[in-house]
Amino acid sequence: MSIEEIPQGADVNVIPKNEKKARELIKKLNLKQIKGISRVTFKQRGNLIYAIDSPDVYRSAAGTYVVFGEAKVDDMNQRIAEAQAQQAQQEALQKAAADAGKTEDKSPEAITADLEKASLGDKKAEDEEEDEGEIDETGLDPKDIEIVVEQTQVSRAKAVKALRNHDGDMVNAIMDLS
């Protein structure tokens, strides 16, 4: 039978010439074939695995095994990386679906709460504007004020206020503003 005579998609096992010779020699050694084994794996250092699906396994009287089949290299590090990437992608999809599922609440209570939050934000802005007026820096070292402003990225007035609240202690003033 030639290759042209085999129908497309047929399940045919083609045994190489060397493997055929090895099988004939195995039969002469009186090895017993073991049935029911669906997969054989050989593990090597570095999480490298050689896997043989649907192998032909023979056992000698001494307890050694001879395995025939097509070996496929299976890199566990690559598998783990792929699994982690797939898991991260699934989590991102779930998060996106959860975010898309959230709809804004347009009940009167929610609108009132939003307005109150906005008005509190306006009060904070007014406080900041009041701080920008005349600043009384008496009793404070100008270098301390500059250090607090640099470290916390706040206005000079807020830095002076924090230093006054902490009796000129720069560390506590910076921690308070951070």
Swiss-Prot record:
InterPro entries: EGD2/NACA0like, NAC-like_UBA, NAC_A/B_dom_sf, Nas_poly-pep-assoc_cplx_dom
Ranges of biased composition (kind: Low complexity): 82-100
GO molecular function: phosphatidic acid binding; phosphatidylinositol-3,5-bisphosphate binding; phosphatidylinositol-3-phosphate binding; phosphatidylinositol-4-phosphate binding; unfolded protein binding
UniProtKB keywords: Cytoplasm, Nucleus, Protein transport, Transport
Compositional bias ranges of the Basic and acidic residues kind: 101-126
Region feature Disordered, mapped onto this chain: 82-145
Subcellular location, record wording: Cytoplasm; Nucleus
CDD domains attached to this UniProt entry: NAC_NACA (cd22054), UBA_NAC_euk (cd14358)
PROSITE patterns: NAC_AB
NAC-A/B domain ranges (all copies): 16-80
Location of the UBA domain: 140-178
One Pfam family linked to the record: UBA_HYPK
Database matches in Gene3D superfamilies: DNA helicase RuvA subunit, C-terminal domain (1.10.8.10), Nascent polypeptide-associated complex domain (2.20.70.30)
Any one cellular-component term (Gene Ontology): nascent polypeptide-associated complex
Composition bias, Acidic residues: 127-139
Primary location recorded for the protein, binned into one broad class: cytoplasm
Gene Ontology BP terms: cotranslational protein targeting to membrane; protein targeting to membrane; protein transport
Function: Component of the nascent polypeptide-associated complex (NAC), a dynamic component of the ribosomal exit tunnel, protecting the emerging polypeptides from interaction with other cytoplasmic proteins to ensure appropriate nascent protein targeting. The NAC complex also promotes mitochondrial protein import by enhancing productive ribosome interactions with the outer mitochondrial membrane and blocks the inappropriate interaction of ribosomes translating non-secretory nascent polypeptides with translocation sites in the membrane of the endoplasmic reticulum.
Protein name: Nascent polypeptide-associated complex subunit alpha
Organism from which the protein derives: Candida albicans (strain SC5314 / ATCC MYA-2876) (Yeast)
Gene that encodes it: EGD2
